[in-house]
Amino acid sequence: MKKYLLLIVSVFIISESQAQHQQLQQQVQYLMQYQFDKTTKYEDINLETLNYTGSPYINSSFLAGEIYHNNKLIADNIPLRYNALVDEMEFKPSFGTPDSESSALMKSPEIDVRIGSKVFIFVPYQGGIEKGGYFEVLLRGEKFDLFKKYNKRFTPEQKAQTSMTRDVPARFTDNPMYYLILENGRFVEIPSRARNFESAFVGKENEIRSFIRTNRLDIKNEADLIRIVNHYDSIN
């Protein structure tokens, strides 16, 4: 079973200048580490031996990122990547560290992550961490926010049944979902089908339909979706 590192933010009573220096020079020391076993139904998938297409990651490579605790930067230029299949944020102490030695960041609503231009937050479910998940923040509006949930479907490898057929490799496929976040914090899933799309924008269905037609927007295009939600936010 793969071992993961659970990260807990350490509290240091030091000046701001000292804190900044520590962040740049000794980032990993801001995090106390201990091991625990992560139990998921995908825990035994070995990507090194598996014949597959697609990827469980939104980006297979580790990219330079930042970790924030209560909106305060605690780790900068740290190698990060998001495993959407098991909903884990992975990190390494350095880019020279083998990927096999990567660790999982503690899931906490107090910890946010930035990977490149993408900002991820952890949202608990009914007050609990276990069933909560990571979301990418696409828009922060005055009244409404737009979050993206990355979902990966895993289809196991299928061995050839006869000599006339071939093995079908396992595959990871993307199935993202988008959520409108209301002022009270409630998540409303935005339908992907055109006939139901406007139902997410309660009270402004006609205005949203007109805005889409006038601007020739594609609801399946993420940039257009951001425009739509931003417009909805502006007319409420």
Predicted region positions:
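Aromatic-patch recognition
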Residues: I58-N59, L63-E189
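Short hydrophobic/aromatic-rich motifs at helix boundaries and adjacent loops
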Residues: Q26, Q35-K38, Y179-L182, F197-A200
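Bacterial Sec-dependent N-terminal signal peptides
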Residues: M1-Q25, I228
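N-terminal ordered "arm"
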Residues: N46, L50-A64
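Long, compositionally biased interface segments
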Residues: E189-S192, E198-N236
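Exposed alpha-helical structural elements
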Residues: Q23-Q26, E110, N196, E207
